[in-house]
Amino acid sequence: MSRIGKLPIKLPTTVEISHQSDATVQVINVKGKFGSLQRTLPEELKIEQIHNDNGSSLIVSFENQTRTNKSLQGLYRTLINNMVIGVTEQFVIILTLQGVGYRASVQGKSLVLNLGYSHPVEIDIPEGITVEVTQNTTLNIKACDKEQLGLFAAKVRAWRPPEPYKGKGILYKNEQILRKAGKSGKK
């Protein structure tokens, strides 16, 4: 049995969980104060909700303990746990823009970045993601869905990944860039 997969998921009182199952798949819905998330799970996955004095918790297990099911048990437990954390607290990724003239702003439903190109870069902000710009160079990106948040942050960062010679680019908070020395001239 997976070490992570056998741990129970603690449910806060503000979270509502419901799941329906068909012949081939089951769907779990998680609702909280920041929104609701939905995910399809395989039919052989068992989800038990246990109520006790400390509150309620979920236990994720497979009926048939094959090698692949043991590894997938930890995966699905973590995915459901991320859904619970997302609807109660939200996930945050902070990006910083480093470079002369690099600026960001939010205009309506799009993020506008000035990254040294001849034109500003406009990126549409997906549904469920909020972007706040502080000091024109720091982006606070928040979302309930951790997967969607990571994909959007990677999409923004892909426009100007950090380069090792001058250290310019879009960086995650606390990211260290390995700096390289430039060419040394003939002596």
UniProtKB/Swiss-Prot annotation:
Belongs to the universal ribosomal protein uL6 family. Its main location: plastid. PROSITE patterns: RIBOSOMAL_L6_1. It comes from the Eukaryota. One of its GO terms (molecular function) is rRNA binding. GO terms for cellular component: chloroplast; ribonucleoprotein complex; ribosome. The keyword Ribonucleoprotein applies. GO terms for biological process: translation. Keywords: Chloroplast, Plastid, Ribonucleoprotein, Ribosomal protein, RNA-binding, rRNA-binding. It is found in: Plastid, Chloroplast. This is Large ribosomal subunit protein uL6c. InterPro entries: Ribosomal_uL6-like, Ribosomal_uL6-like_a/b-dom_sf, Ribosomal_uL6_a/b-dom, Ribosomal_uL6_bac-type, Ribosomal_uL6_CS.
